[in-house]
Amino acid sequence: MFRLVSYRSDRTAPSWRAGVASHHALIDLAGYADGTYRSVRSFLAASPDEQEQILAWTTRQLDGGEQVLSLDEVELGPPVPDPEKIVCLGLNYPEHAAEAELDIPPVPTFFAKFRNSLVGPTSPVILPAASHFIDYEGELVVVIGKRCKHVAEQEALAYVAGYTVCNDVSARDLQMQTSQWTAGKAIDTFAPMGPGIVLASDIPDPQVLTLTTRVNGEVVQRESTSQMIFSVAATIAFLSSFMTLEPGDLIATGTPSGIGARRQPPQFLHPGDIVEVEIERIGMIRNQMVAEARPQTR
């Protein structure tokens, strides 16, 4: 099984490189076609035939090429560090809507995050001094593979490149200050994602996956994606009815029940806490919470 990843060997490098990982081995895509594919987005924008050729080349490299790296020697970043859009669903599991004491929405409820929120699967999450009510939300993320607009639900999965894992970290006090949730969602480092993109060909049905979230080793969320109110296909059909989806766009499909704000007593995140989100057949992200450094005062 291949995973598309963004990585860097040097933590001081200004940008992420694109690679294909298999088990613990990694092939840098810059070695193919004179460096044409230096980003995951450029791979996703390639034609299906070209993608097949790239993956065939990757297989040959893994079988004895000179460009094999070890995943243990690199830092993984967000799989798509430069998406055009990050669309996030809210209230997409019935038990989560119930714990939030909200009605099931008639159409998908969504909001946006931005690139500043993206970090890798093991990067620290910075807890802002402006909030004391930080929460976790484990989610399945859909990565769009082909431009689409006005897509029928029965055809929607054909436009998916693959799937990855996200923690939609949320500052509940900032989120609920207004009817728009952006202030509590689009915070720096609040979308750790990874470890890579598992291709859609390896996950023909995204509605049969088990999602598990752990805080300091304790399971706090466990649910099947079969329980989504709006399936991946239905969500793509809805969004594409009024916006063009592009290769590399990310759709976070909502979190199940078990969020910290609705536990008794509430369980918010603190510096030192470690949150793991794992989805079967895709992988796990593991991020430590770190307090924001306060600015120096004169």
Predicted features along the sequence, with ranges:
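Short catalytic-site patches enriched in acidic/histidine residues
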Residues: 109-128, 148-149, 189-198, 256-260
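A generic local secondary-structure boundary/capping motif
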Residues: 5, 76-78, 98-101, 125-134, ...
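Non-heme Fe(II) oxygenase catalytic core, chiefly the N-lobe of the double-stranded beta-helix
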Residues: 120-156, 161, 166-170
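Catalytic-pocket segment enriched in acidic/His residues
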Residues: 15, 52-55, 69, 75, ...
